[in-house]
Each structure stands twice: as structure tokens, then as C-alpha cells.
Amino acid sequence: LSFAVRELGCIAGINITASHNPPEYNGYKVYWEDGAQFTPPHDKGVLEEVLAIEDLSTVKTTSEEEALRSGKFQVIGKEIDDKYIENVKAQVVNQDAIDRMQKDITIIYTPLHGTGNIPARRVMKELGFENVYVVPEQELPDGNFPTVSYPNPEAEEAFALGLKLAKEKNADLVLATDPDADRLGVYVKDAKTGEYHPLTGNMSGSLLCDYVLGQKQAKGLEKQAEAEEKAAETGAKETFVYAAVDPDRAYGFVAVAAG
């Protein structure tokens, strides 16, 4: 949805979802024209408009036929999915590393009965990862979330079936997305003990930042002088200096110092 809003030049996007909440809940997520969820003052403005409605009969409506005819309503198809997948794949910073390791890494994935199954597995397949297994009990969409009480990939309970399958397959990585696929949980295997450990959001973010910056540094795409020039142009008050142990590793964070 975030991608489609920007790609199609929409002023907003709406997702009817309870996200990672229990099945008795429902919800309403609104995205602004930048593809991000509403923030002040837009959220307040929308709420004020809703509260101003005294009678639903006064709300202006139009028929689906008229909306289609006027171009205000469009049913998006596979072309948006394809563009989104290509955009995600374009974010890869080291395809060579993937090519070297894709046959040696085993990944367990669960969409937790939600919408992530097709796009997540498609991206991994098209990038070349061959050993990807989905948790069968949680593969298909089901708003009742029968295998978990709380489909939040931050909760240990949500990983129970994924970790069980990971041990059976001797997997290296366990991934879970929440039902509307905008939240990611990660477990990694300790190569020494064979135990699986969760990564917090802060850990995952730090590792991603470390890896992307390490790849850019290794390829000479971001010289310090260039970074300082960009910082000056954008009004940034701090410059960040990065040091990596091994640019081919997605871990090994050493230091990020403000200067």
C-alpha cells in the first residue's frame, strides 16, 4: 500500500486491518501521500472530519460505476505487485554475496496467517534463496489466527511453530511478519550452541544499518567528504563516521561516532 500510494500519486491510502492485534479487533490505518502512516497534523485533521459527521446520510457518496467512469476509482492489478517486487529487489546492496551463500542458508518463514506469504517468498525466491520453508500451519490467510493468540512477531509465542520447524530443518534464520506484513520478527541460530535467539527491532535496525553502510563503504559509494557535503546541503548538524569489521557479514558492528 505504501508503495502504491507513491507509485500512483495518491493523496492517501487506507488499510482496513487489526495488524498484529488479537482476532477480536479490527482497525483502520491511513497513509499520507508520502506512503508513511499519518502523523500530526494530518491525523488530527482526519479525526476532526470524522467527529463532525452527525448523520451518515449527509456524507457525499457516489456509485462504483460512476467512480470507475470518472477515473476516481481504480482496481490495481498484478502490474503494481510486479513493480513493488522489483523495487524491493533493487534495494539489494550485494547480490554477489547472496549468490555465494544462497545454497548454504536455510530460512524458515511464517506470515502468521496474514498477507506476507506471497510477496515475501517471491522476493526470496527471485533473489536466489533456495532453501526457504514456510510454516504450513500458518501459511494461508485466516483472520481467526488459530495457532496463536496474539499474531505479533515481537512475541515469543508467535515463533513457536517456526522455531519447531527451524530445529527440524537445521535452519539458520527464522523470519515472521505480522498479518498486514509491516512488522518483522527475527530469530538467528547460534552456530556454536545451535540455540535460536531473537533480535529486537533495535538490533535488526543496527545490523541493517551496519551492513548497508559497510557495503557502500567497501564499494566506495559514500566517501566521507561526500557524506559531509550531503549533510551540509540537507542542513544536518552531525556527521557520522562508520567502521566495519567485514563488509560481507551482516553483523560485527564496531562503532558509529558522531563528529
Language model features by range: what are they?
Residues 1-11, 155-172:
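Conserved phosphate-binding catalytic cores of ATP/NTP-utilizing and phosphoryl-transfer enzymes
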Residues 17-19, 43, 137-140, 179, ...:
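Short, ordered loop/turn segments at secondary-structure junctions
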Residues 54-79, 190-259:
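Proline/glycine-rich low-complexity loops and linkers
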Residues 1-33:
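Ferredoxin-reductase
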Residues 21-24, 115-117, 141-144, 181-185, ...:
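Flexible loop/turn segments at secondary-structure boundaries
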Residues 26-160, 165-166, 225, 231:
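Gly/Ser/Thr-enriched, mixed-charge loops and adjacent short helices
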Residues 24-32, 182-201:
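Short Gly/Thr/Asp-enriched flexible loops that form oxyanion-binding sites at enzyme active sites
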